[in-house]
């Protein structure tokens, strides 16, 4: 296949980490990658805002912070205003009113070279969409661990 590329692929991620209200050892995500000659970082930012407004049925506060991921340059982390507490601060957002929902960035030139593409000709946009956190925000769930619990009273809400 030749560029341009547009991929969206789902997956379940397993991590060896301590669990808390925002972190679980296993979670679901979508990864999206666009590689094209004219796809800009600004286009990616518009795409992110569009995804979030579709998921939540309205515009939500969004901010982008610099972040490091070895396969993108520059890298960023996308935060949205915490909908569990309305941005006032809670255990989900660590009392700051924001929660990270998507890391991403522009594919690193070495990634493009490894795909047989000239990084001077092609650019792109990568984002990792954490579904569990988006569902937390959409339904006001204050603990991600509940999704993997055996509590049928909680789980039956989502039939």
Model-predicted segments: where are they?
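TRNA-recognition modules of translation machinery and tRNA-sensing kinases, especially anticodon-binding
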Residues: 1-159
């Amino acid at each position: 296949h030749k560029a341009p590329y547009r991929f969206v692929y789902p997956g379940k991620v397993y991590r060896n980490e301590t669990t808390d209200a925002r972190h679980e050892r296993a979670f679901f995500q979508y990864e999206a990658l666009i590689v094209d000659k004219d796809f800009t970082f600004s286009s990616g930012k518009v795409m992110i805002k569009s995804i979030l407004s579709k998921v939540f049925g309205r515009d939500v506060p969004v901010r982008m912070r610099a972040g490091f991921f070895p396969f993108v340059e520059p890298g960023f982390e996308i935060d949205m205003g915490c909908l569990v507490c309305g941005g006032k601060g809670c255990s989900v957002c660590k009392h700051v009113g924001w929660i990270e929902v998507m890391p991403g960035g522009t594919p690193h030139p070495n990634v493009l070279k490894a795909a047989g593409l000239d990084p001077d000709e092609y650019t792109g946009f990568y984002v990792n969409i954490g579904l569990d956190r988006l569902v937390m925000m959409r339904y006001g769930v204050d603990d991600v661990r509940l999704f993997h619990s055996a509590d049928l009273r909680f789980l039956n809400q989502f039939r």
